[in-house]
Amino acid sequence: MQFDTRVLRQWNVPKLRALQRYALRRAGEDSLPQVAGSLTFTTVLSLVPILTVAFALFTAFPMFQSFRAAIEGYLFSNLVPGNISRPILTYLNQFSHNAKGLTAAGLVGLVVTSVMTMLTVENALNAIWRVRQRRPLAQRVLVFWALVSFGPVLIGASLSVSSYLVSVSAGYVAKLPYGLGVVVGLVPILLSAIAFAMLYVFVPNTLVAWRDAFLAGLVAAVAFEIAKRGFGYYVARFPTYTAVYGTFAALPIFLLWIYVSWLVTLLGATIAATLPIIRQGYWQRRAFPGSEFFDALGILLLLHRARDHAPRTLGELDIGRRLQLEADYVADLLIQLKTLHLVGKLQQDRGQAHWALLCDAHTTTLRPLYEKLVLSLPRLSRTAFAHQLGDTRVLEAQLHNPALDCTLEAVFASGEPGVVKAAAEAAAAPAAATLAASARA
């Protein structure tokens, strides 16, 4: 019996195309190449201070001094292509050694530079997760100080365990089946995946599931390894920078590699941020003229129902899950509703705002909401009838639709069918106005 692939195509091809459109739109919104370039510049300024602070811990704690050489070798053999790792390691060690002779004011400047770079990283990740509320400065500094302080220690401990396992199994790798040697060789990728996952979980000021963070970290680690090998092959086979820059060739090559590294890191962050959306299917939402008005009515209906149950509020993530809408799209609609004094933000829970309905549903009509979300000029410019009705007031003069004078209470009394009916009746007004304008033309 042959399998009919037409059914499979009917279910998967449209979804894959929608997912492709969503991925391209999300990548454009996040501006990953531009953000990676900005982070490259700040990384160059703060790389020496961060390494100075991190490696100073091994001097302060004698029990960890043996880790430093192992960590340096691990970092520059797994994070930097071998063609440029040796001169870069020499320069950074020299710079870090020179930094130890700075005065107190100079050391404060180095620490400030390091913190500013870390804050830039946090801002970039918050933008990818669409987080609008930042942590207090003290908490942000403590989080990054913990990452810089304990990160090398954890890496050193992991390297010690890995070295012990490799030494124990050295005599058995050739005899054991199922590619145990390959498994041992995957330890650096696993460590990189864990490091990426920790970055994605702890840095953004929002709740990130460990499974999403680790899966994205694993993708980033594999992409990082592929990029490292490809970059090393390119530098070895096409020594363009060496021919042009001579002895200074390591600097532009290192800058380019930092840029590629940040690009991979941000790509992994985008994957971690979009996995919940893809898993729930929110990326398949289709936008149409009046869709924001319809979705805003759905949000108001949920908040209206929440009034009867404690705590009488709903979080942005909860609203998005119930309506199957993206978190950033829900946040934008809530801000629009807040400007109309229809809803209010009451509290903040680690990046997730909680909202409540503030307006009187018995007296508030649909007209202000419709004028805000449908008749505003920036939104009209994206609709099909914008070229016929360029002036918002011309369109408004055509709209004598009694459905817009209906109160929210009357709409919500019928539940979801009432919302659909109100949106459908209100959506008839633009079509009527378009026909009238075409008749006059």
Curated annotation (Swiss-Prot):
Record keywords: Cell inner membrane, Cell membrane, Membrane, Transmembrane, Transmembrane helix
Ranges annotated as spanning the membrane: 44-64, 101-121, 141-161, 182-202, 207-227, 248-268
Coiled coil: none
Disulfide feature: none
InterPro entries: UPF0761_bac, Virul_fac_BrkB
Signal sequence segment: none
Cellular component terms (Gene Ontology): plasma membrane
Highest taxon, organism lineage: Bacteria
Localization in the cell: Cell inner membrane
Pfam family, any one: Virul_fac_BrkB
Membrane topology: Multi-pass membrane protein
Family the entry assigns: Belongs to the UPF0761 family.
Protein name: UPF0761 membrane protein RSc1559
Organism for this UniProt entry: Ralstonia nicotianae (strain ATCC BAA-1114 / GMI1000)
